């Protein structure tokens, strides 16, 4: 019977999301989003903040045998422990010489940004040494790092006795993008070879052979390239056929594109190329290049192109001759910003290099496929016994060399697998910068998990899941993590499958994070299954790391479908089909005609929120219809102008991938506004202090109250202040001893401000009132009494004398005693509100003239 319950739940899970018609499935949204502080607090991030006098931590070399990560930066080389980068940190200072810095400054370069030694080459030379090169303040320099044979040797030092010119190995300009690869003692590098940055070339240096490079100052070969990666890919089982593949972007060739445009390329050359005999001497004779295309097909054949290559990652396969190539692209436009990731197969790349060459008859002609005779052996073919039987490129016929020099480009572009990108991002704040991929073995197959770095210092963890075929992939964003304290572009990434760690570099420093955080997905089987993370599975008690070799039948994982109903047995044997037995009910109160916000936010950002209302004495659950009065936000449900019909139990569901999970059960009770008004009026007329519960009532509902009996907030506050300030013993108002009429103690703004001063200041600044009670007190409307003098109009307050001041003080001290004898006349009602408004306006400097006229005279 369990399977019948499962089918029933599955049908309910499919039917309910259909009723959430206004919403659509959240695509390209990370399921979890972790901030920098959350990563640190959960011990999922280790950071090295770098040195104050160093930056540019973007040259990585993974040394798995010694368990170290080598990082080249400005004037320094670092060695980090792969387990924890903050443990056993080693560093070597390698600054540029003062004379080179001075020359760099005199050449017009920025002393702080350019005239340092930025390490740009870190390549393993042998078992004990690392070949290292830096910009050297626009004077490239190279040397060796001694590491020792084993990690226990604990050796990390720079060979101070060996330095050589780094021209053709390291760029002059630290901002210039370059790549290098060291194979069999020979260094292959793509870089610029002059101070001005105009001579771009692909070099092969070191070793026993003569240095070799691409044709110089020929835009058909290279046109201001920026190199992003160099890799060795075998062509056959014969090592003589091995080829070097380069990934770069350059300006479009003349006639290739209207206007100035950036073209992404893949280039190839033979590892055993020795140059030509009479032509192309010490130049590559097997160099070919082709365009890499990454675009989204559009209507009427108009595609959206991502032109600028940013990074490349080769995912090795069982057959080393056919790795899968992942490439990161961005748009060239400043108006439309987007990023994409495309996959390429070596079969498609080889097919393009075996296709037609690009050709044009003159500068005024279009590029067309070459239709003439192609010489033998085909240009681009490596000299070996497998293809052609030539022992060296120096033995190639002259027509082959001439054709290769005039036709370095292929006509057809390399199309991505599936004809479109596997990941696309547009209309977002960030762009992709770096990429590494890990192939993970899961319960239902292998999956490639991508870790994508952005220019805001965040990392996206994305898995592609095949739907009908491997060419139709579903993109699932598992996590988005902030790995640097400030937004900064991620410029380097390395992945260690042995340590299960990811290492990231930027201008701010180095960060390290694990590849998986299974515990953050939740504490339930359904949450772990819905995550669809190939690294994680439910082991019966928690979401933990999945190991394919573990012989545990309780492991539950479903990456392809993400269906908890088929994996989590507790959902089948639970009598509570809706799952609300485990959800705690919360009671909240609202006032009629006010607003109420019911908070409910799912842990997963991919989940959709679905609300139901169960009214009192009604077992049915009614769907919440979103309208002008009800608004659904990412954090909950906002109800404007509560009514009695809103009372009841609100049920909040999370709908994700066809599965419905209850989140909250909120019991809302709506209080009639008339009832609240009666309570407030009763509290206002009661002479005793209100009960504590009445104060809580007032404080809970004050922000939402819209009672008709209270004309303004000022009147409301006046009532509350009077009730709070009323002393325990009732005092009688002041009485004029001569007339027996009670005089209200009305303070002017000036006396109110004086009451805030210390007693001495209050005595000095007190208004001067005559001691004789029969003296006439001028009303406020008469203003200041003035007398005429020969010198002009003089205010009477300037004619007051010192004895008058003393008498006024004595009169003020005597008034409280006199006031006790008079009758008590309590004052309540609107006059207090009017005075409070006038007091506030006078404090803000308004109606100053009225204030001067209404102030009583200080002396007579």
Swiss-Prot record:
Domain Sema, first and last residues per copy: 31-515
Region (Disordered): 725-860
Pfam families from the UniProt entry: Sema
Positions annotated with a glycan in the UniProt record: 53, 126, 593
Entry's Gene Ontology BP terms: artery morphogenesis; branching morphogenesis of a nerve; cell migration; cell migration involved in vasculogenesis; motor neuron axon guidance; negative chemotaxis; neural crest cell migration; positive regulation of cell migration
Location, primary (coarse class): secreted
GO MF annotations, alphabetized: chemorepellent activity; neuropilin binding; semaphorin receptor binding
Cellular-component GO terms for this entry: axon; extracellular space; glutamatergic synapse; plasma membrane
Signal sequence range: 1-17
Disulfide cysteine pairs (residue numbers): 104-115, 133-142, 270-382, 294-342, 518-536, 652-717
Ig-like C2-type domain span: 579-668
Gene3D superfamilies membership: Immunoglobulins, ligand-binding face of the semaphorins, domain 2, YVTN repeat-like/Quinoprotein amine dehydrogenase
Keyword Disulfide bond recorded: yes
InterPro entries the UniProt entry points to: Ig-like_dom (IPR007110), Ig-like_dom_sf (IPR036179), Ig-like_fold (IPR013783), Ig_sub (IPR003599), PSI (IPR016201), Semap_dom (IPR001627), Semap_dom_sf (IPR036352), Semaphorin (IPR027231)
Bias-annotated ranges (Polar residues): 748-764, 782-818
Function (record text): May influence outgrowth by a variety of growth cones including those of the posterior lateral line ganglion.
Entry similarity comment: Belongs to the semaphorin family.
Protein name: Semaphorin-3aa
Organism whose genome encodes this protein: Danio rerio (Zebrafish)
Gene: sema3aa
């Amino acid at each position: 019977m369990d399977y019948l319950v499962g089918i029933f739940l599955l049908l309910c899970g499919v039917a309910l999301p259909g009723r959430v018609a206004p919403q659509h499935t959240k695509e390209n949204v990370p399921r979890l989003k972790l901030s920098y502080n959350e990563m640190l607090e959960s011990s999922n991030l280790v950071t090295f903040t770098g040195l104050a006098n160093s930056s540019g931590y973007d040259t990585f070399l993974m040394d798995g045998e010694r368990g170290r990560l080598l990082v080249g930066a400005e004037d320094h080389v670092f060695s980090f422990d792969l387990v924890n980068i903050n443990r056993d940190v080693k560093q070597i200072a390698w600054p540029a010489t003062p004379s080179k810095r001075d020359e760099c400054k005199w050449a017009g370069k920025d002393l702080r940004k350019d005239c340092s030694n930025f390490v740009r080459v870190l390549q393993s030379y042998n078992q004990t040494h690392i070949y290292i090169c830096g910009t050297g303040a626009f004077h490239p320099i190279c040397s060796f790092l001694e590491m020792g044979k084993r990690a226990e040797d604990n050796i990390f030092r720079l060979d101070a006795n060996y330095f050589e010119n780094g021209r053709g190995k390291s760029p002059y300009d630290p901002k210039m993008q370059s790549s290098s690869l060291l194979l069999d003692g020979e260094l292959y590098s793509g870089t610029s070879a002059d101070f001005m940055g105009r001579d771009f070339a692909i070099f092969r240096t070191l070793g026993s052979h003569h240095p070799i490079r691409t044709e110089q100052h020929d835009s058909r070969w290279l046109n201001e390239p920026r190199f992003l990666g160099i890799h060795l890919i075998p062509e056959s089982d014969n090592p003589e056929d091995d080829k070097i593949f380069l990934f770069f972007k350059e300006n479009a060739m003349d006639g290739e594109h209207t206007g100035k445009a950036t073209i992404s390329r893949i280039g190839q050359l033979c590892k055993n190329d020795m140059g030509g005999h009479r032509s192309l001497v010490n130049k590559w004779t097997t160099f070919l290049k082709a365009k890499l295309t990454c675009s989204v097909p559009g209507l009427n054949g108009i595609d959206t192109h991502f032109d600028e290559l940013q990074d490349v990652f080769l995912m090795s396969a069982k057959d080393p001759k056919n790795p899968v190539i992942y490439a990161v692209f961005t748009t060239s436009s400043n108006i439309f910003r987007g990023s994409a990731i495309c996959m390429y197969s070596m079969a498609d790349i080889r097919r393009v290099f075996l296709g037609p060459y690009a050709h044009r008859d003159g500068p005024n002609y279009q590029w067309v496929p070459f239709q003439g005779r192609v010489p033998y052996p085909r240009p681009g073919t490596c000299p070996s016994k497998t293809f052609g039987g030539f022992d060296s490129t120096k033995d190639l016929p002259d027509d082959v060399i001439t054709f290769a020099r005039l036709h370095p480009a292929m006509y057809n572009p390399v199309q991505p697998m599936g004809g479109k990108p596997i990941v696309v991002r547009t209309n977002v704040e960030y762009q992709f910068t770096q990429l590494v991929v890990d192939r993970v073995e899961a319960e239902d197959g292998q999956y490639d998990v991508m870790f994508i770095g952005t220019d805001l210092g965040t990392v996206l963890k994305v898995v592609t899941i095949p739907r009908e075929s491997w060419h139709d992939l579903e993109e699932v964003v598992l996590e988005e993590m902030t790995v640097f304290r400030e937004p900064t572009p991620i410029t380097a990434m390395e992945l260690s499958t042995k340590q299960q760690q990811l290492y990231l570099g930027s201008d701010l420093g180095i960060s390290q994070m694990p590849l998986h955080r299974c515990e953050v997905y939740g504490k339930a089987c359904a949450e772990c299954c819905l995550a669809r993370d190939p690294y994680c599975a439910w082991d019966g008690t928690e979401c933990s790391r999945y190991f394919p070799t573990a012989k545990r039948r309780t492991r539950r994982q479903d990456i392809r479908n993400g269906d908890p109903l088929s994996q989590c047995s507790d959902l089948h044997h639970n009598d509570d089909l809706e799952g609300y037995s485990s959800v705690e009910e919360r009671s909240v109160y609202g006032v009629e005609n006010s607003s109420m916000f019911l908070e409910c936010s799912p842990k997963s950002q991919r989940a959709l929120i679905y609300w139901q209302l169960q009214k009192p004495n009604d077992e049915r659950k009614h769907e919440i219809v979103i309208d002008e009065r009800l608004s659904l936000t990412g954090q909950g449900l906002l109800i404007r102008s509560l009514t009695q019909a809103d009372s009841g139990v609100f049920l909040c569901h999370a709908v994700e991938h066809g599965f419905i999970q209850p989140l909250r059960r909120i019991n809302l009770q709506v209080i009639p506004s008339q009832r609240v008004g009666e309570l407030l009026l009763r509290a206002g007329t009661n002479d005793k202090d209100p009960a504590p519960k009445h104060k809580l009532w007032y404080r809970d509902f004050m922000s939402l109250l819209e009672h008709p009996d209270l004309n303004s907030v000022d009147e409301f506050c006046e009532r509350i202040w009077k009730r709070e300030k009323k002393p325990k013993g009732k005092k009688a108002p002041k009485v004029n001893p001569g007339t027996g009429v009670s005089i209200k103690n009305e303070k002017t703004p000036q006396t109110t401000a004086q009451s805030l001063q210390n007693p001495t200041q209050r005595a000095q600044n007190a208004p001067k009132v005559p001691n004789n009670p029969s003296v006439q007190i001028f009303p406020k409307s008469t203003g200041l009494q003035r007398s005429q003098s020969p010198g002009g109009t003089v205010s009477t307050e300037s004619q007051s004398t010192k004895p008058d001041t003393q008498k006024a003080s004595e009169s003020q001290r005597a008034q409280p005693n006199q006031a006790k004898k008079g009758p008590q006349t309590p004052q309540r009602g609107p006059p207090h509100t009017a005075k409070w408004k006038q007091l506030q306006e006078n404090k803000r400097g308004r109606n100053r003239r009225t204030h001067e006229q209404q102030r009583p005279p200080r002396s007579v």
